[in-house]
């Protein structure tokens, strides 16, 4: 059992805090509609000089991240994002130790021509769409990038191999005065509890076939998290994964799980527990991933009272859906009361009764 109080505004949960900070630091969301920008060139269709320049720039950025060279990375970032670098500095500091000793391999590069994008009447940058056909096939990789200023862009995926756990470092780049500079940074692990995204996808399919809808739904979440390089990327394969997940989704969460649509679970004592979020987490690095459950708490209590409530909530969750006991290490309960710091407690499955 592990307990901690979360710092409000720093990390909403262990699972998505790093990702959110990185994107918030480097991409500004816009409310305008998406602008069509069809000019996408995949690496197989690029001129060798263009491919080499983009790959070299991405490898250089990845090397700076690996070395924890925040100053160097800031110097290689477009001006409008370099001036407010606190978020990305935090992400680099959290990520760099996990990359030590790894080999950097440029996996994919794309050229995205956003030179025809138009700013809104208020000067805001539009959302942009790029549709990339892969190797003259029916498969596509699509980019829907929010708040993208007009310009010439590239997207690069650099894998870090040979570490205890492999990582993916994805970069959005923009050409400034003939040089590629960073305009977005998206680090994600390539494995969780020792398994990659394809493994979780296959396991989710098997769970769905066994009518283990809750397990399948959560494992599909883990698969997507490991396979998607950045939140604004969609692909033919990811669409297939999402379609499979939708067909396996339990009816109780067909509209998702949120503050407006909580999952209500009744405990053995008749008490109701309202979960406002349900996902997965691998922060402990165990042999199985954990469930991450956000619990609405009306009245905040002291640590002992919150721990007791969280234990009861975890028991109610596994009591309602006992299939979850098999493929998960444990359950994180993040107790959240309005105006208070979240309080997170992890219970191994063997502790939950």
Question: Model features per residue range: what roles?
Answer:
Residues 37-67, 184-199:
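Short, low-complexity N-terminal intrinsically disordered segments enriched in polar/charged residues
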Residues 41-49, 55-56, 71-140, 224-254:
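Short solvent-exposed beta->alpha transition segments
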Residues 213-229:
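TPR/TPR-like (Sel1-like) alpha-helical repeat modules
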Residues 196-215:
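Alpha-helical segment of the N-proximal tetratricopeptide repeat
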Residues 22-32:
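Bacterial N-terminal signal peptides
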Residues 236-324:
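Intrinsically disordered, low-complexity segments enriched in Gly and acidic/Ser/Thr residues
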Residues 38-39, 128-129, 143, 147-195, ...:
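Short beta-strand edge/turn micro-motifs at domain boundaries
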Residues 5-23:
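Bacterial N-terminal signal peptides that target proteins for export
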């Amino acid at each position: 059992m592990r307990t901690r109080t979360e710092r409000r505004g720093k990390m909403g949960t262990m699972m998505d805090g790093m990702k959110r900070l990185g994107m918030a630091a480097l991409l500004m969301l816009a409310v305008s509609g998406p602008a069509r920008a069809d000019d996408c060139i995949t690496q197989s269709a690029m001129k060798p000089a263009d491919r080499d320049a983009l790959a070299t720039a991405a490898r250089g950025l990845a090397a700076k991240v690996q070395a924890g060279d925040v100053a160097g990375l800031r110097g290689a970032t477009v001006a409008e994002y370099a001036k407010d670098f606190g978020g990305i500095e935090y992400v680099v500091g959290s990520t760099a130790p996990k990359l030590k000793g790894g080999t950097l391999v440029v996996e994919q590069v794309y050229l995205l021509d956003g030179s025809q994008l138009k700013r809104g009447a208020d000067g805001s940058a539009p959302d942009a769409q790029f549709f990339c056909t892969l190797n003259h096939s029916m498969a596509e990789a699509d980019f829907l990038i929010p708040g993208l200023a007009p310009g010439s862009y590239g997207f690069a995926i650099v894998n870090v191999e040979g570490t205890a756990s492999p990582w993916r470092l994805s970069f959005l780049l923009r050409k400034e005065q003939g040089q590629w500079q960073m305009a977005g940074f998206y680090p994600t692990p390539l494995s969780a509890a020792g398994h990659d995204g394809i493994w979780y996808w296959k396991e989710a399919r098997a769970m769905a076939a066994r009518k283990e809808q809750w397990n399948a739904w959560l494992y599909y979440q883990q698969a997507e998290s490991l396979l998607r390089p950045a939140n604004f990327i969609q692909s033919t394969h990811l669409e297939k994964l999402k379609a499979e997940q939708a067909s396996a989704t339990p009816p109780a969460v067909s509209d998702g799980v949120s503050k407006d649509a909580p999952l209500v679970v009744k405990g053995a004592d008749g008490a109701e527990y309202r979960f406002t979020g349900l996902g997965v987490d691998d922060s402990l690095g165990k042999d199985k991933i954990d469930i991450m459950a956000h619990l609405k708490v009306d009245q905040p209590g002291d640590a002992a009272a919150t721990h007791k409530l969280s234990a009861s909530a975890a028991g109610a969750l596994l009591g309602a859906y006992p299939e979850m006991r098999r493929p998960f290490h444990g359950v994180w309960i993040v107790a959240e009361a309005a105006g208070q710091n979240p309080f997170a407690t992890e219970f191994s499955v063997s502790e939950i009764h």
